[in-house]
């Protein structure tokens, strides 16, 4: 259990811009779980909520990038067919 707490703290210390999609998603799930569980003071809850918002935004950026790569690949495939 202590290792899990250390892992959570290390993840929270990692800049969001350096996290991959899966790491962002997993941390976001954990943030939501902690917020839903309750028992945190207001400041801790706000800090978690802000981190969650940043994580959600980064997840959306990763998905938008993946979507663009797929669209580009499909467009290139269609151009090759012509």
Swiss-Prot record:
<keyword id="KW-0540">Nuclease</keyword>
<dbReference type="InterPro" id="IPR037004">
    <property type="entry name" value="Exonuc_VII_ssu_sf"/>
</dbReference>
<protein>
    <recommendedName>
        <fullName>Exodeoxyribonuclease 7 small subunit</fullName>
        <ecNumber>3.1.11.6</ecNumber>
    </recommendedName>
</protein>
<keyword id="KW-0269">Exonuclease</keyword>
<keyword id="KW-0963">Cytoplasm</keyword>
<dbReference type="GO" id="GO:0008855">
    <property type="term" value="F:exodeoxyribonuclease VII activity"/>
</dbReference>
<dbReference type="Pfam" id="PF02609">
    <property type="entry name" value="Exonuc_VII_S"/>
</dbReference>
<keyword id="KW-0378">Hydrolase</keyword>
<dbReference type="InterPro" id="IPR003761">
    <property type="entry name" value="Exonuc_VII_S"/>
</dbReference>
<dbReference type="GO" id="GO:0006308">
    <property type="term" value="P:DNA catabolic process"/>
</dbReference>
<dbReference type="GO" id="GO:0005829">
    <property type="term" value="C:cytosol"/>
</dbReference>
<comment type="function">
    <text>Bidirectionally degrades single-stranded DNA into large acid-insoluble oligonucleotides, which are then degraded further into small acid-soluble oligonucleotides.</text>
</comment>
<comment type="subunit">
    <text>Heterooligomer composed of large and small subunits.</text>
</comment>
<comment type="similarity">
    <text>Belongs to the XseB family.</text>
</comment>
<dbReference type="GO" id="GO:0009318">
    <property type="term" value="C:exodeoxyribonuclease VII complex"/>
</dbReference>
């Amino acid at each position: 259990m202590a290792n899990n707490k250390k892992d959570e703290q290390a993840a929270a210390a990692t800049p969001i811009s350096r996290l991959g999609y899966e790491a962002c998603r997993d941390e976001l799930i954990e943030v939501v779980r902690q917020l839903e569980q309750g028992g945190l003071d207001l400041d801790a809850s706000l800090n978690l909520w802000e981190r969650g918002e940043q994580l959600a935004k980064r997840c959306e950026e990763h998905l938008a990038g993946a979507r663009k790569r797929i669209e580009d690949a499909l467009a290139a495939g269609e151009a090759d067919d012509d």
